[in-house]
Regions:
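Juxtamembrane transmembrane-helix termini
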Residues: 28-39, 74-84, 108-115, 138-146
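Juxtamembrane loop-transmembrane helix junctions in multi-pass integral membrane proteins
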Residues: 2-9, 41-55, 79-86, 90, ...
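Hydrophobic transmembrane helix segments
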Residues: 17-66
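Cytosolic juxtamembrane helix and N-cap/initiation of the first transmembrane helix
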Residues: 1-31, 48, 142-147
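Loop-to-transmembrane helix junctions at the membrane interface
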Residues: 67-98
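Physicochemical signature of membrane-embedded alpha-helices that form the seven-helix bundle of GPCRs
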Residues: 10-17, 21, 53-63, 87-97, ...
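Cytoplasm-facing ends of alpha-helical transmembrane segments in multi-pass membrane proteins
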Residues: 64-73, 133-143
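Alpha-helical membrane-associated segments of multi-pass integral membrane proteins
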Residues: 12-14, 98-102, 108-142
């Protein structure tokens, strides 16, 4: 396997790692963290509003993580067999745009509400993910053009 395909394989593994990290962090926050412990339920709201919020967060996380797994697995398959389909480049581009949008929203939140350790960690995660998606796209296009 040449260097370009090895780099594509490495970035595919990193993207799968980010997807696993996202799932683990959300599950730990929901079931072990204190993210929902201090929520005040407004009057007239159903009693199970916190459970509904947790379910919604799990669904959003699942929808967010599925393209990451697809891009990572498909990129690894293309690194092994360059003649397979090329839909992973489009989805990596979509994830790259979402990472940029997330960084922009994090910076906007930091400007409006002040900085915190959570906002810095979210910003750093966004930068790292955006760089990995960009590099993934670069190497996937090189593999597509070479084979």
């Amino acid at each position: 396997m040449d260097r370009t395909r090895k780099n594509l394989m490495a970035f595919s593994i990193f993207i799968i790692g980010f997807a696993v990290y996202t799932v683990i962090s959300v599950v730990l926050e929901l079931f072990m963290g204190s993210g929902f412990d201090n929520v005040t339920i407004p009057e007239g709201a159903p009693e199970n509003v916190v459970d509904m919020a947790k379910t919604f967060l799990l669904i959003v996380t699942g929808v967010m993580v599925l393209p990451q797994f697809y891009v990572g697995i498909k990129g690894a398959c293309v690194a092994k067999n360059p003649n397979s389909s090329k839909g992973h480049i489009f989805w990596a581009g979509v994830l790259f745009v979402f990472a940029l949008a997330g960084m922009g929203l994090t910076v906007l939140d930091m400007v409006n509400n002040g900085t915190s350790s959570d906002s810095f960690s979210m910003l750093i995660d966004g930068v790292i993910e955006a760089v990995f998606y960009f590099e993934f796209i670069v190497y996937a296009r090189r593999v597509r053009n070479e084979y």
